[in-house]
Amino acid sequence: MVSKNKLYYFYYLVIDLECSSSQNIPLDIQIEKLEKLRLCVNKILNSSTERLHQKKVRYINSTGDGYFIIFDIGEDALKFSIEIHKYLNDHNEKIKNKKIYSQEEIDSKTIIVNTGISCGISKPVKQIDGQIAYWGSDVILAHRIVDYAKGGYILCSSDVYKNMKNTKIGEFVNLECSTSFKHNLKTDVYLFYNKEDKEKFENVNIHLLR
């Protein structure tokens, strides 16, 4: 039972579909991408190997072109992000290898998601429809961080790095750019990647950002 008078410390994950409303992509393809992302999230939540995800997700809500998900534990947020990117990378590879598609069709059907993760204090608030949402500057920070990413990366706040830097499932790279977002929200930004992708990311630089 959620208490509206209590403060909670959570990990906040925002998944954002890149170029979701691009005028260069037909509307039916845009909707197809949104549906594929929904199926991807649903599959991770309900897969036989990761069924415990259902218990680890505190809250989930659609943002229109992505999802906002709250986790109790930081490692669960990182694992979920890795699974999302694995699933969509496999999807993109299948599209790329289908000889029936032109390069233009491949480009339009390729699904890229950017991911932002923050952590900190939030408080439950009642929405106009009666549902409970969570509010706090650290919640907003996750949305700001995901707007900073480009090209399908997982970016984290400095607090996530401090809490999770010893995790065994991946590595953090300091992008060496202290950012100041709207409403004076500030954080260093860290790239997080799966250890299996070390060769791809070990020489990454800050130019992956906007």
Regions found by a protein language model. Give the residues of each.
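Catalytic core of nucleotidyl cyclases, primarily class III adenylyl/guanylyl cyclases
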Residues: 49-76, 93-137
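Amphipathic alpha-helical segments in well-structured domains
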Residues: 34-38, 81, 135-142, 172
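Catalytic NTP-binding/metal-coordinating core of nucleotidyl cyclase/transferase enzymes
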Residues: 1-83, 87
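Catalytic/regulatory signature loops of cyclic-dinucleotide turnover enzymes
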Residues: 137-159
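A generic structural signal for short hydrophobic patches within well-formed alpha-helices
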Residues: 20, 77, 122, 160-161
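Residues immediately flanking
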Residues: 15-17, 109, 119, 158
